[in-house]
């Protein structure tokens, strides 16, 4: 279903694309197509990686200024390594997270996973592969959030012998709703660029990482992540807000209504154009619904969350 829209013009999504447009405050699905089907998600995987790291940091009271050592496995992944991390380099969790989420840095994602995974194994008194332990935490998070069409096989989304991880637009919406509740998550996804550095044998290496999501900073868009691979096509998840509506209820009370949409595009050939078009359409549909008094939404148009 296209939600009653002609799917042409305005950068609307093409055929074969999977997409979902959601009002994040009511979980109202404003527009969707092929949104329940499982497909490869490439670097969108790193959203789950980031959230597992941040949940661990909060649970263990570990500051993101903590320094991690780049593991040997980071040198064997391939794919994006925008700041040239090599095994043995030392980088803060914060800078590794910035490079992973903004510049889709595979080596930084692997570094985060190895550090957190080894801490989890140590705390539980178990041996094993730290990165495999971390991936199991990603899959546990997916299970808790009802992401039944999701399976993570690594922390970065690169295609390898065991596949590249798969999900659906609907499942990714569940993950993003959870992630957006966390201000520390949105800090990393909302910046257009950030200075990061790491230590290599006592020498500081400094870089500016630039967000691969070129829509961030326009149209109220403040996240979230890009992904692309031969099997996944072009993917992007964006979120945008508009100023709150504030109504004076008298007697000093105010009614404040926030407005935020989430747009997920998978398997595209023009992810930014399609996402921007779907966002514009989404706001039109949303405004129509609000102006009609926000009538009750049919149950099949509400994203089921867990």
Model-derived segments and spans:
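Penicillin-recognizing serine hydrolase domain
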Residues: 3-18, 117-306
